[in-house]
């Protein structure tokens, strides 16, 4: 067990990588410990670190494909085994590593018959293809396949609106998340007032960076977020008579949403982000992919709207309703309003 292998220091806070492996080119795993921590500190650090790992680290993706010979996304091309949609989905799965800023152009230009893989992508020097064996398409006849690509570096999700492009450009939904998953667990030891904790942090990445690199980048991002609070020369603002404070009243969404908007109290809901709630990761990710980031965004949707979200289930809607009732005494209408 890790407890037997780790020598816990009672004075200096230390971290250590206790397990690291590469399951394949697109799946890395790392397990880390941080100790000794006072009671409650491990959970505080673990929650913040997990959110930073999943939401604050930048990744590189293919965000657009262009070919003037393609009539629409769901068409089939003679001599190519896959449909255009399947090719776009394969391009979405390509794992890239880069230090670029903004967007860069890349391309694929091959002649069949042959298998087209990520190795056939002609990319800028600043972009590295992690797994060159990733499949893109199968050309069954002696035809030319030329596709222009757009590569971006960003964070989170970038959901494209599906449409038939007139200039042959086809946006690709991008998931700029090099960390596939992150978990934390806590081991307590000691008795009474001497009780301390060890934080275990597990990280899975897509191979574009190692779990150790992800841990370092997430830590830097958290530090950058807290640095403004350390500025000693900031003015002290004193609020008198509750000026500029907005209370969250108990109300029913159906009856008083219009009144809340007239009074401009929706600003309070704009300041409450959905990652502050108790939503499970799958539900949270579905909402983020639909550009629902704040409580106000959520309240602008009905239960019917939520059920239209891809991979959303009735159980997810019930869980959201329970959280809204528990913390805000708010309801969502069943149908559009």
From Swiss-Prot:
Entry text on domains: The N-terminal domain is essential for RNAP assembly and basal transcription, whereas the C-terminal domain is involved in interaction with transcriptional regulators and with upstream promoter elements.
Record's keyword annotation contains Lipid biosynthesis: no
Organism (species): Buxus microphylla
Gene3D superfamilies with a match to the protein in the record: 5' to 3' exonuclease, C-terminal subdomain, DNA-directed RNA polymerase, insert domain, RNA polymerase, RBP11-like subunit
EC number of this enzyme: 2.7.7.6
Region (Alpha C-terminal domain (alpha-CTD)): 266-337
HAMAP family registered for this protein in UniProt: RNApol_bact_RpoA
GO biological process, one term: DNA-templated transcription
UniProt cross-references to CDD domains, sorted A to Z: RNAP_alpha_NTD (cd06928)
Taxonomic lineage of the native organism: Eukaryota, Viridiplantae, Streptophyta, Embryophyta, Tracheophyta
Compartments in which it is found: Plastid, Chloroplast
Keyword Nucleotidyltransferase (UniProt): yes
Family stated for the protein in its record: Belongs to the RNA polymerase alpha chain family.
Annotated region described as Alpha N-terminal domain (alpha-NTD), given as residue ranges: 1-232
Gene Ontology terms for molecular function: DNA binding; DNA-directed RNA polymerase activity; protein dimerization activity
Keywords annotated in UniProt: Chloroplast, DNA-directed RNA polymerase, Nucleotidyltransferase, Plastid, Transcription, Transferase
Any one GO cellular component localisation term in the record: chloroplast
Protein name: DNA-directed RNA polymerase subunit alpha
Functional description taken from the UniProt entry: DNA-dependent RNA polymerase catalyzes the transcription of DNA into RNA using the four ribonucleoside triphosphates as substrates.
């Amino acid at each position: 067990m890790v407890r037997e292998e780790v020598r816990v220091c009672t004075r200096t806070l230390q971290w250590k990588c206790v397990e690291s492996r590469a399951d394949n080119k697109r799946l890395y795993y790392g397990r880390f410990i941080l100790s000794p921590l006072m009671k409650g500190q491990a959970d505080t650090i673990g929650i913040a670190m997990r959110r930073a790992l999943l939401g604050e680290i930048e990744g590189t993706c293919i965000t657009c494909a262009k070919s003037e010979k393609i009539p629409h996304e769901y068409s089939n091309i003679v001599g190519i085994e896959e449909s255009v949609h399947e090719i776009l989905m394969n391009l979405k799965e390509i794992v890239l590593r880069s230090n670029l800023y903004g967007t860069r152009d890349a391309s694929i230009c091959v002649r069949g018959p042959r298998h087209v893989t990520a190795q056939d992508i002609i990319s800028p020097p600043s972009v590295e293809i992690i797994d060159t064996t990733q499949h893109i398409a199968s050309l069954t006849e002696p035809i030319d396949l030329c596709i222009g690509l757009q590569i971006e570096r960003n964070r989170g999700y970038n959901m494209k609106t599906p449409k038939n492009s007139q200039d042959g450009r086809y946006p690709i939904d991008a998931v700029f998340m090099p960390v596939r998953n992150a978990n934390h667990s806590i081991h307590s030891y000691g008795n009474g007032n001497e009780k301390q904790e060890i934080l275990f942090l597990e990280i899975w990445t897509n191979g574009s960076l190692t779990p150790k690199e992800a841990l370092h980048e997430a830590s830097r991002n958290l530090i950058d977020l807290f640095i403004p609070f350390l500025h000693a020369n900031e003015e002290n603002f004193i609020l008198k008579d509750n000026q500029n404070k907005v209370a969250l009243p108990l109300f029913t969404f159906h009856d008083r949403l219009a009144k809340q908007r007239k009074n401009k109290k929706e600003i309070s809901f704009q300041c409450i982000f959905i990652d502050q709630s108790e939503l499970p990761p799958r539900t949270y990710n579905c909402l983020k992919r639909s550009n629902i980031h704040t409580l106000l965004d959520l309240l602008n949707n009905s239960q019917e709207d939520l059920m239209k979200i891809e991979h959303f289930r009735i159980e997810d809607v019930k869980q959201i309703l329970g959280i809204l009732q528990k913390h805000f005494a708010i309801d969502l209408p069943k149908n559009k309003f």
